C-alpha cells in the first residue's frame, strides 16, 4: 500500500490533459494565514492518506467513480514562497491552464486564501459563480488597505463578491459561528441552525 509514487488515489501523475475530465492538483501555500501555518503540507498529507483507500471498493456505490471520470494528478502549483505578492497570479495562471484544456478541478490546499485566485480563473471561464462555503468564518472581512489587495485568508470572499466573481444571492455559507458586520449578501446557515437541522433540511 505504501510503496510507489504518492499520487492522489493512485491516479496517474501527468501534465498531459488529453482526454482528461478531472484534474487533481495541490497549492501548498499558507503564507496568508494570520495565526497557524502548516497547511502548505496539506496536499502532500491528503495524497498520502488517499492511497490507503485507493485499492478498496468504492462503498456504498456500485460503481467506480474513476470509470466515469478520467482523473489525473497534475502535481502542485509552482510558485516562489519568498515572493508571496506574486503567488495569486501564479495560482490563477495554474488554474487557467487546466480550465483551458476543458477539465474540472479538485484542488488541495493550502490556506483559505487560495480560493480567491481559483475563483478568478473559474469566473473567467464560466462567468459569475455560485458558492457553497463550509466554514466557521465568513471570510468576507474587508482588507485594511484595499489599494494593496492584501493576501489574507479572511478577505477572499469579500473580494470575490465585490469583484463579481460570485453571486452572493445564489451562494450559501454553512456553519458560521463568528460575527461579521457585513456578510456581503451571502445566504448564511449559522452553526446553531446546522446543529438543529438534518442534512436533508440543510440541503
Residue locations for each model-derived region?
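Conserved alpha-helical scaffold segments that buttress catalytic/binding sites
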Residues: 1-203
Amino acid at each position: 500500500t505504501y510503496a510507489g509514487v504518492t499520487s492522489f488515489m493512485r491516479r496517474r501523475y501527468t501534465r498531459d490533459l488529453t482526454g482528461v475530465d478531472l484534474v487533481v492538483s495541490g497549492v501548498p501555500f499558507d503564507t496568508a494565514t494570520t495565526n497557524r501555518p502548516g497547511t502548505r503540507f496539506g496536499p502532500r498529507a491528503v495524497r498520502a492518506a488517499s492511497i490507503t483507500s485507493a485499492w478498496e471498493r468504492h462503498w456504498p456505490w456500485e460503481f467506480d467513480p474513476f470509470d466515469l471520470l478520467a482523473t489525473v494528478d497534475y502535481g502542485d502549483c509552482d510558485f516562489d514562497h519568498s515572493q508571496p505578492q506574486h503567488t495569486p497570479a501564479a495560482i490563477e495562471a495554474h488554474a487557467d491552464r487546466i480550465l483551458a484544456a476543458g477539465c474540472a478541478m479538485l484542488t488541495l490546499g493550502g490556506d483559505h486564501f487560495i480560493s480567491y485566485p481559483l475563483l478568478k480563473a473559474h469566473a473567467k471561464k464560466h462567468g459569475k459563480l455560485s458558492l457553497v462555503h463550509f466554514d466557521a468564518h465568513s471570510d468576507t472581512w474587508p482588507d485594511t488597505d484595499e489599494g494593496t489587495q492584501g493576501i489574507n485568508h479572511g478577505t477572499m470572499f469579500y473580494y470575490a463578491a465585490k469583484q463579481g466573481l460570485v453571486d452572493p444571492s445564489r451562494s450559501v455559507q454553512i456553519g458560521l459561528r463568528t460575527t461579521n458586520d457585513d456578510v456581503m449578501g451571502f445566504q448564511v446557515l449559522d452553526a446553531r441552525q446546522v446543529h438543529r437541522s438534518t442534512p436533508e433540511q440543510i440541503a
